[in-house]
A protein has these predicted regions:
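Metalloprotease/metallohydrolase-associated module, dominated by Zn2+-dependent proteases
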Residues: 1-54, 71-118
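Active-site recognition of the HExxH zinc-binding catalytic motif
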Residues: 58-70
């Protein structure tokens, strides 16, 4: 299964760009990065994603969750009381994860990767 070049979530198109390891990690010291200004883009360490293992899934899901945080404006939950804040944040994250798993072009890649993890 080929890794998609873009996904659509919540009506937004998000570019998925695989970067050479030297650029991703050695230069910027990160395995992935979400850019919230248009065009929305998630940069991922190509070497890590191509391994197709637990770390690959973790990095991918981590960066998609940055989009969820941005899209559902979770930075604004500071104004809510603790119980309301927690419920809004957890519900938003759950909605974003379900959308990523069921409604994006990442679904097949994620399922294949999960099946192949030993």
């Amino acid at each position: 299964m080929k890794f998609p070049k873009k996904i659509k979530m919540s009506g937004f198109e998000i570019n998925l760009v695989l970067l050479d390891h030297e650029i991703s990690y050695e230069v910027s010291e990160q395995q992935g990065s979400f850019v919230s200004k248009p065009p929305l883009t998630i940069y991922l360490d190509k070497k890590i994603i191509e391994r197709g293992d637990r770390t690959s899934l973790n990095v991918l899901i981590h960066e998609v969750l940055h989009f969820v945080y941005y899209q559902y404006q979770l930075n604004l939950t500071k104004q809510l009381d603790d119980e309301s804040k927690e419920e809004k944040e957890v519900n938003s994250i759950a909605n974003g994860v379900i959308e990523m798993l069921l409604d994006t072009d990442l679904k097949e890649w994620i399922l294949k990767t999960i099946r192949e993890i030993k």
